[in-house]
Amino acid sequence: MSVREDRLMAEYETMKKWRSRVVEWRAIGNSKSPDKYEVTYHVKSIIGFDNGRPLTHTGFKVIIEFSGDYPRVKPDVHLDSQRPWPIHPNIWPDGRFCLEGDQHWIPGVGVPMDAICQMIGEILSYQEVNIRSAANGNAAMIDWVKKNLVFETGSNTKVKNPIDPSPIRLPDIDDSVKWGTDDQEPPQQRIVFG
């Protein structure tokens, strides 16, 4: 078995143990070592602005794909083609994510799949915002984020509030309910991933 297949199997085993009340995922490809995942986040994120006020939407599907060069190269992480897409300083206009782990990717070692999913969730729910190296320079969004979400301490930027103005909420655990459908929205409280 190749190093790639070993790592993909390990990533899949990690995902089978990972749980979140606001995330659904499915593996695509080889049943023991899948190289693609669809991960749906049932969180509220900003999709635009109306007179300086954020417009939000809940429910985003993210595709995580491992190339033939994995684990030497990081996986491709992007939103699927279904719109609306969230706008965020750390999501490129073409839907690719600029993850914190990108700067720390060590060829052959990488970042575990559950940590990647955690980072994506924190970005979508505006719990993680890096405006210093913004992938998306949308001026209205950056201005709103600076005024409402972040404060700076020395060289660091910290999130002071998730999305406008109250924290994001988690659904109660109820396997019979599919959160994020058009007619249901989760009750509000801070999201914990994993």
Model-inferred region functions:
Residues 1-59, 69-194:
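UBC/E2-like fold recognition across ubiquitin and ubiquitin-like conjugation systems
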